[in-house]
Swiss-Prot record:
<dbReference type="Pfam" id="PF01809">
    <property type="entry name" value="YidD"/>
</dbReference>
<keyword id="KW-1003">Cell membrane</keyword>
<keyword id="KW-0472">Membrane</keyword>
<protein>
    <recommendedName>
        <fullName>Putative membrane protein insertion efficiency factor</fullName>
    </recommendedName>
</protein>
<dbReference type="InterPro" id="IPR002696">
    <property type="entry name" value="Membr_insert_effic_factor_YidD"/>
</dbReference>
<dbReference type="GO" id="GO:0005886">
    <property type="term" value="C:plasma membrane"/>
</dbReference>
<comment type="similarity">
    <text>Belongs to the UPF0161 family.</text>
</comment>
<comment type="function">
    <text>Could be involved in insertion of integral membrane proteins into the membrane.</text>
</comment>
Amino acid sequence: MKKFLIFLIKVYRKYISPLKVPCCRFYPTCSQYVLEALQKHGIIKGGFMSIKRILRCNPFCKGGYDPVK
């Protein structure tokens, strides 16, 4: 399951992301954060961290440097 999710993120980054205007308020980008979180913490904790991060990526959040810990 983890490999499948990582595959989906890579497909998104290669084919869908280039079509959009860059708008992520964080570094690393949300898609990179998701990849790192899944690889480092697994599907449960990494998935939860990813959802929290994506919900924070909005116009009302300042953004900035937010690495996977």
